[in-house]
Structures are given as C-alpha cells and as structure tokens.
Regions:
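Carbohydrate-active catalytic/glycan-binding domains of CAZyme proteins
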Residues: 4, 10-519
Length: 519
C-alpha cells in the first residue's frame, strides 16, 4: 500500500470564491489537470494520478465524509501490476482524489480450492495455482451496509479452458470482503466465495471456434452490483454477456446467498438459486454485448434503476438505463420495452461523443451511480481517448445527474467541476450552442453541430432551424422544437483555458441529446 503523503501536482487544483452564487461564479477557476495523463501514468507517479488509471469504478460515501472509489485492475501500461488488487482512492469534493493503494494483497486462498472442488464434481482434473497475473480482478462494487460496516463484492476470472483445446473457457467467481472503516485500506477482510458461473448444459462444454451463440454458461459471475431495498432485503445483481443479468437474494446478516447453491452445472435449466433473469437484450441469446449492471433505488421516484454497459469497451461502450417498481422487474425502458423479457434498453445515457476543439471521449460506460445524501446524484465511469490519440488512456469521469419530470436520470455531457449553480437567465441562452444527437450508432463518436438561438425565440441555425424556443426559469429547462432540454452549469473542459458554461441533456422516447453553450 502507498504509505506516503498524497502528492498533487500544481495542475490538480480548483477553487471557488466566498460570497453569493453569482460572485462565486464570476471567480470560478476550473480544474486544470490533464486529460491525457501519459506523462504521469507510471507507478512511481501514483501520488499524482488523481483520476488517471481508473476503470470500472464503484463509489461510496463514507462516514468520514470522503467519497471512496474502487476499481478493476487496469491501468495505462499495466502500471498497477505487482501491487495488489482493487485499488482505491478518495475525495472530499469529487475533483481532487487521493491515491490509497490496493485493498487486496493477493489472490484469495479460497479461489483455487473452490475451482478444483467444482472441477472434481465435473470429472475434470485439478489445476494448480497459476501466476497471479493470469487471473482477472474485475469490477468491484462497494456499499455501506450500516454504520461501521461496508461490503465489497468483487469478480475474479480464472485462466485456462475447462478441458483443453476445443472446450469453453474457465469459470469466474464473485467473492466478498468487509471493512469497518474505509480510511483503513488494510482493513478489508475477505469473507470468501459468493457465486460462480451457472450452466444449463451439464457436461457439454465443447465449443467450436467462434461459436459464441452456443455458450456453455448461462450466467456469467462477474460485474456484481449490491443493493439494500427500502424493506431491508439484500440483493446481488450480476452478469456479463452470455444470457443476461440476474438478481440473487442475499442473507442480510452474512452477505452470502440466501439460498444454498447447488451444483453450478445442470441440464435443461440453470439452477434457480443462482439468480432470476431481470435483463436481456434478446431472449435466448447466449452471447450478447451487455455487462456492468449498476442497480440503485431513488426514494423520490420510488423506482429501481438498472444501468447497463452495452457493446465492447474500447470505443463503442455506451450506457443504458431501465427502471422497475420491483427489484426483480419487470424493467422497462423509456420506450416501454420490457427488457426483462428481452429488448434493447433505452434511453442511451452516455455514448462516444466529441465537442469542437477536442478529441472527445469514447468507451464511457460501466458506471457507478451514487448520491451525496442531499438529493444530488452522480455518475462515474471511465472515459477513453479515441484511437487517433491513445485508446489505452482511461481517465475517471464524474458527472452530475438531473432527473426529468418523468423520473429518468439525465447524465450531464460535461464532467463535474464544482461550478457554482447560480440561476441561469434567459439572456444567457441567446447565441450559439454545440448540439449533439447522442442517439445510438455502434462505435461512432457523435460530433457536435452548431445551433443558434436568437433573441426573438427562434432557432436560426442547426438541426431545429426555424423552430421556436422558450425557457422555464423556475425549473431551468430550455424547450426547443418541443423538446425539453434540462440545463445545468458545468465546467467547459474543451475551452482553453477551461472555464464554466451551460450544458443540457434530454431524452425523448427514441432520442438522447447533449449540448453546451459556445463561448
């Protein structure tokens, strides 16, 4: 674990002023740390990482007032290798992040024995412990259980094939650790095995090259998300690709499965105790590009929200959301489609994009959703620079969420930068905007175009040219061509020097829009 004092370079600063919100806004200074962090990507520069080298984050607000972030083992140039697993950092303001180091020293002792126990039951030869670097340590989820108790559910993928060439890949596990004090990064105590991949194919684990549709596993035991319902029930939501996302109830005291788990191979049906299907892109499809479920409950709307990552992580990654009144579904999209029975999930929440005067961002998904306890909600994920720059750069992104009148979460297009939220006036809306139709196109970085609002409430340029606009000052909503655009002040990360601007986000039944005011 990193024991030294946190070290921020001069770039990692921001400030606001005392006084009224208008005075604070006038004095606002934006964060100026670099998006392309290659110069500080090395392990010996970790004290300056801030949000560099973040992938698949999970965020929890600790009792000490810090936000703690944990993540997949991934970094530019694999800088983390040999330094433990599920690395952590913390922040008081969601902008300046202190590196804390690993939470897990080495591969848990239960993994290989549990793997061989399952292999023995399947009539397969035992395996030896492989080099630690060959295991995957992926996608943790950390939640507060109560004062003085936190749980981390984590994924470990095992190397190799089930029975040599021509057979399916080895299984994965979800395990769990507990901690009583998040500021003690050495305080995580491993509690062991939770669940593994479940199959409905018995011992039919042979596979031909490229035959993904005939996947041996039905449920994939990675990408856990953990929730405690208002009634006090504990649930684990997990899954990646394969047949979809499942919900498994947990014992609220131990955090272990509520039902005893039988053998993870069966014929005809996957064992029911391994989970109940809550989301699938296509019923019966055993290899579908969806993963990274994140489940939250909003007491104001009384809905459960299931966020998902779609497509491959390098560039096409995009985020979707559906909602339900019940933890086990059915989950419906904004278009009314039942994703529990099988449908593509809408709306699109994030998508590869590009504002002018920038390279833009891709791979923006596998998110964490969290709130500050005061009604303010946030979205965190990695973002990657496009391949034309360096797609291996993975920077942590934190964005604000606004909720629509109909109870859907809108993620703001610009990253959070603690901009004072002085009321937006109608006069500020007149002029040029960068407008993005963020509707889904596989792997395409959606670019902005100019939209001009005139002082006579007309649109003189852009997609909605010759339409009219109006402004609801009380609710801070700009309506253009009948579409409600939810406004917020955020940092203009593309400006040089960075400053503040006004942004918007919007959903219709089949469209997502992002935009920002041009300077």
């Amino acid at each position: 674990i990193y024991q030294g004092d946190v070290v921020y370079s001069p770039e990692f600063t921001f400030s606001t002023a005392d006084g009224t919100l208008d005075e604070q806004l006038a004095a606002y200074q934006a964060p100026i740390y670099p998006d392309n962090y290659i110069a500080i990507a090395d392990w010996n520069m970790r004290g300056q990482w801030n949000l560099a080298n973040v992938h698949d984050p999970t965020v929890v607000l600790g009792e000490d007032g810090y936000y703690y972030m944990y993540q997949t083992d991934a970094s530019y140039g694999n800088a983390h290798e040999g330094h433990g697993h599920f690395h952590a950092r913390r922040s008081k303001n969601l902008i300046d992040w202190e590196y804390l180091g690993r939470t897990m020293k080495e591969l848990p002792g239960w993994v290989v024995p549990k793997l061989n126990e399952i292999r023995q039951g399947m009539g397969l030869q035992p395996v030896a412990t492989a080099a630690e670097i060959s295991y995957g340590f992926w996608a943790p989820c950390v939640r507060k259980v109560r004062n003085g108790l936190y749980r981390m559910y984590y994924s470990i993928t095992c190397p190799g094939l089930l029975n040599g060439e021509g057979t399916w890949s080895e299984r994965a596990f979800i395990g769990m650790m507990e901690n009583t004090n998040l500021s003690n990064n050495d305080g995580w105590v491993d509690k062991g095995y939770i669940v593994t991949n479940a199959s409905d194919k018995g011992f039919e684990f042979n596979v031909t090259a490229g035959d993904w549709a005939n996947c041996y596993y039905k449920w994939n035991a990675i990408d856990p998300s953990y929730i405690i319902t208002p009634e006090g029930a504990h649930w684990l939501i997990y899954g990646s690709w394969h047949s979809g996302i499942v919900a498994m109830e947990l014992n609220e005291v131990t955090g272990m499965p509520k039902q005893s788990l039988g053998i993870p191979w069966a014929e005809g049906n996957a064992p029911a105790e391994y989970g109940q299907l809550i989301a699938t892109r296509q019923a019966g499809n055993r290899w579908q590009a969806s993963e990274g479920p994140e489940i939250v409950y909003n007491p104001q709307t009384e809905y459960y929200y299931l966020f998902m990552a779609y497509d491959a992580l390098e560039t096409p990654y995009n985020t979707r959301v559906a909602r339900s009144k019940s933890i086990t579904g059915p989950y419906l999209g904004i278009d009314g489609a039942n994703v529990t029975e099988g449908a593509d999930m809408y709306p699109v929440v994030t998508h590869p994009y590009k504002f002018a005067k920038s390279e833009g961002w891709v791979g923006i998904s596998h998110c964490a959703i969290f709130d500050d306890g005061n009604g303010n909600w946030y979205y965190a994920s990695q973002g990657r620079l496009p391949e034309s720059v360096d797609n291996a750069v993975m920077l942590g992104h934190v964005r604000s969420i606004r909720w629509t009148k109909d109870g859907w979460p809108l993620v703001m297009p610009e990253r959070y930068g603690a901009v004072p939220q002085a009321a937006i006036t109608e006069e500020e809306l007149i002029g040029d905007w960068e407008h993005i139709d963020l509707s889904y196109v596989f792997g395409q970085q959606k670019e902005s175009s100019t939209m001009t609002l005139t002082d006579d409430h007309k649109v003189s340029e852009g997609t909605w040219k010759d339409s009219s606009w109006s402004f609801d000052a009380e609710n801070q909503i700009l309506t253009v061509n009948g579409v409600d655009l939810y406004l917020q002040r955020e940092t203009d990360w593309e400006a040089k020097p960075r400053t503040h601007t006004i942004v918007y986000a919007s959903y219709t039944d089949n469209k997502t829009y992002w935009g920002k005011k041009s300077k």
